[in-house]
Amino acid sequence: MRELYLVIAYDTPDDRRRARLAKLLKGFGERRQYSVFEARLTREQWAHLKGKLEALVNKEEDVLAVYFLPPEAVGRTWRIGHEGLKRLEDPDFV
């Protein structure tokens, strides 16, 4: 079964909802920035997470975006900073 590679970013003016979103997403992926997470999920896990996100997000006040990355793009990820973060590969491409 192919895994899905996701980048999830959100913004909400509500502190309580922001904390709940962070707690939910920590259970599915790794925090990369304050409101940005990366996740590697099965389709079943994604369906479960999607349902929880739809129930939590206020469509009138919040913004949440999920970016689906192809597997080959994940191997070409480049990051600087935070020693604890894993570098997936060190690409030399333009």
UniProtKB/Swiss-Prot annotation:
Keywords: Antiviral defense, Endonuclease, Hydrolase, Magnesium, Metal-binding, Nuclease, Plasmid. This is CRISPR-associated endoribonuclease Cas2. It comes from the Bacteria. Mg(2+) binds at residue 11. The lineage of its organism: Bacteria, Thermotogati, Deinococcota, Deinococci, Thermales. InterPro entries: CRISPR_associated_Cas2, Virulence_VapD/CRISPR_Cas2. SUPFAM superfamilies: TTP0101/SSO1404-like. GO terms for biological process: defense response to virus; maintenance of CRISPR repeat elements.
